[in-house]
Design a protein with these regions (language model features):
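Active-site neighborhood of HAD-like aspartate-dependent phosphohydrolases
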Residues: 1-32
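Conserved phosphate-coupling serine/threonine residues in phosphotransfer and NTP-handling enzymes
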Residues: 3, 107-109
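Short, surface-exposed alpha-helical segments at coil->helix boundaries
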Residues: 10-14, 44, 111, 115
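A non-catalytic, amphipathic alpha-helix used as a structural packing/dimerization or gating element
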Residues: 11, 15, 65-73
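Helix-loop "lid/cap" segments that line or gate small-molecule binding pockets
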Residues: 19-21, 42-58
């Protein structure tokens, strides 16, 4: 869901901070710290490892409480409209929908978080053909389980499918499932992810909109600075690497 909207800095980070405060935990995640923590896949794993670096041991019960309270605050922030679509998302999804292209969400977030986001943005974008969340698989990204399940449910051929991702973990998951991948790193860690985009068919800072053109960080040039169906189709013919 971070590929669709800036869910991390505007949604998950402040929700974690509210949960920490409620539970009297001595953590405050500012943007710089959270940016570094994003290298760790999985929200609770992030909390656990950060606590350990601070010399704080959290029991499983405490971690469960953080998860539950954070989820409440995240859902509330989404419903209040604090989380916004990234550039080009609405335009591209509408184009793909008109062309009859199957569109699936594959995310490491839980079902409740994803459905709250979709409920908030449903008037702006077309419906997706399916959703695979962390609740549906044994292992989240960078494991390929989610993408493999989406391919199975959709009946799509991996050679004719393409993933659009925002993280190194997502890129690894897509590649392990046999998919080519367009990487659009989060604006908060674009420098780090552009360094790790070696397995991506292309790396752009976002999908691009009129007046807000995308910048190609690696890969094929993008006409008029906007990712289109034609551009995505061209990435399917990029030699695998």
């Amino acid at each position: 869901d971070g590929t669709l909207a800036d869910t991390e800095m505007d949604g998950h980070r402040p929700a974690f901070n509210l949960a920490f405060k409620e539970l009297d935990l001595p953590f405050v995640w500012d943007e710089a710290l959270y940016n570094r923590l994003l290298a760790i896949p999985g929200g609770l794993r992030r909390v656990k490892l950060h606590a350990e670096t601070c010399g704080v041991h959290l029991s499983q019960n405490q971690l469960d409480q953080v998860r539950d309270r954070k989820r409440v605050h995240y859902l509330e922030r989404v419903r209040q409209g604090h989380v916004h679509l990234r550039p080009g998302v609405k335009r591209l999804l509408q184009e793909l929908n008109r062309a009859g292209v199957q569109q699936w969400i594959v995310t490491s977030s839980g079902s409740a978080s994803v459905m709250a986001l979709l409920e908030q943005i449903q008037k702006q974008i077309p419906s997706f053909d399916g959703v695979v969340t962390s609740d549906d698989v044994a292992s989240g990204k960078p494991a390929p389980d989610g993408y493999r399940l989406a391919l199975e449910r959709s009946g799509a051929n991996s050679a004719a499918s393409l993933a659009i991702e925002d993280s190194a973990a997502g890129l690894s998951a897509a590649r392990a499932a046999g998919l080519r991948c367009l990487l659009t790193p989060s604006p908060w860690d674009a420098d780090a992810l552009s360094e790790s985009g070696g397995g991506a068919a292309a790396v752009l800072n976002h999908l691009g909109d009129p007046g807000q053109p995308a910048t190609v960080l690696s890969g094929a040039s993008c006409q008029e600075g906007a990712v289109t169906l034609k551009y995505l189709e061209s990435l399917l013919s990029v030699p695998d690497r």
